[in-house]
From Swiss-Prot:
Key words of the record: Nucleus, Transcription, Transcription regulation
Biased composition regions of type Basic and acidic residues, renumbered to the chain: 313-326, 339-364, 371-383, 425-449
Residues making up the signal peptide according to the UniProt record: none
Chain intervals for the UniProt region annotation (Disordered): 310-452
Gene3D superfamilies documented for this protein: 2.30.30.140
Species of the source: Arabidopsis thaliana
Protein's UniProt name: PWWP domain-containing protein 5
Main subcellular location: nucleus
SMART domains, per the entry: PWWP
Disruption phenotype: No visible flowering phenotype.
Amino acid sequence: MSTEPEGVESDSNADFAINASSFDYGMAHTSETLADPMSFQAQDLVVNLTGVERKVFVSARDDKDSLCNGVDFDADSDLLKNKDKKGFSKENLKLFDSDLVWAKLRSYPWWPGLVFDKSVASKAAMRHFKKGNVLVAYFGDCTFAWNNASQIKPFHQNFSQMQEQSNSAEFRDAIDCALDEVSRRVEFGLSCSCVSEEAYNKLKTQNIINAGIREDSSVRYGGDKLSDGISFEPAKLVDYMKHLACFPCYDATEKLQFVINRAQVLAFQQWKDYSHFIDYETFVRSVESAATLASLPEVNMDEGISAKKRKTDYKDNAEQTKEKTLSDLTVKKRCGSRSTEKLDGKSHSEKKRKVESSESGKSEKRIKKSQQKEDSVSKHSNEESLLSVGDTNKLQKTAEPCHGTGVENEMNSLTPTLKPCRASKSTEVENEKTKKPRHQELAERKISSPDEMLSSLHAANTSTGIPDSINIDPSNYEDFEKFINELFCSKLNGDSKKASITETSEPCDKKDSAEEEILPANKEITGSGSKEQIGLKDCSADSLPPYALVLNFADSGSVPSEEKLNEIFKRYGPLHESKTKVTMKGKRAKVVFKRGEDAKTAFSSAGKYSIFGPSLLSYRLEYVCPKRKKTT
């Protein structure tokens, strides 16, 4: 790693050199001279690793007017002298072949790249050669330049400052590629001969496709001095992992340290020869995504959710045009599977529709099952009745593993001991008179308290410096979840009872079979005809009471008419069309279903009626209190 003096951030004499004939796509990989891998011992642990060969699709930009100042990078160079087995060194510059650096170009920010000897320069690069400058191959595309010492800075020491220069897609992509190379070097530096030959070769080899590097020199081997076993500090890694477990986020300026620590953990995992190595990496990437989402500014619901906020730091029209054209190549230039995941509004919306579509089918199955089996309750329906559009987004992250989606399979294989969501979708509700007090029932079940459950989740942080596997009894979470569901149902009935009218009456005649299903389930009828306590139907009954679907819109102009609402929602089941109400002032619409099952199906399928577009802010289910009659 170079330790050059700070350069001046003025426009350099180095111009951008390119392949002037074509756009080339390929793997833009960093490389380095072969450094003898070292086995190391830290707390009696020998760390090995495997890695995946990282790729990025890049392009060489055509610029016939650009001029390049050359650099003499051989043994007689004024900058680099005394070539040895590990690379090049210089008394003043201390620059090594394949070092990671930041280099400055006119009209561009400081850009991450690799320094190379002129002996590997391509014909196109040698046409711009000038003695005294260094050949730099840039990350993110196939471009290169000849830079002098004042236009080069060490990568690690200046990362926090340099990464804040721009939010353009190509700049962020170049940084991701550089970080990917840092990760590879760290993993390679912690490797030893005990790993498989195939895995070891993937780690030590880098393939470079750059307009300034000859094809026969595109394969590079090894690591660097900053990434070997000597620089590894196990105690600091364990402290970092403990902190990350408690606070799973990090500042953008700390991303380099995060990548280094992650690579060290991956190396240790490979030494342990875990069969689900890729699953662990997926888990690490999910932490990166969580940190990215947590740092996003809040946006209005009608504008959608955007996890990628882009800013343009360059104001001249030429550079803005360049950014637009290269942004189309961003997807092709990603540096491999370890890049941070990014969500945009469209993909998030499509995922939401997919989840809600699958939930709709499951909802119908649960309805049929509830009609055949008494005393069963759908926990999912109760939870959904309180969700708005924003809450549904949260449901994707927290509830998907509970409903058998693709995320469940991935997370189950990822952390097989963490499965608090395996509780059954319906729970048996006992009769009010025969129920035991909840605290007695919990004591009999020996359910752990929330504090105990939380402490068990943190049990992996041991004093030995190595995270242990987390052993959690899933039955505790099943019983705890069942208890929460029953409390939720009881609270729902209790709140509804407050809004209902308690009066002295006897069983009443209903107009149709649908209303017969709405008979209060918790009536206590005495033979002498004394007072009957009229309550609401318990949530464990075999048929759901009528519900209204309430829709909230962004503005009054987007609220559809009552006829339009009836036409849209009658496909889910019979409606009380006369009760469909539209409040323009409140920007609200209400559709009343005759059967609760139909309302639930419509609610679960809310993502399908995209006819409302972004004007639909939220939707929820509202219980409709049935009318009561006195009979003799």
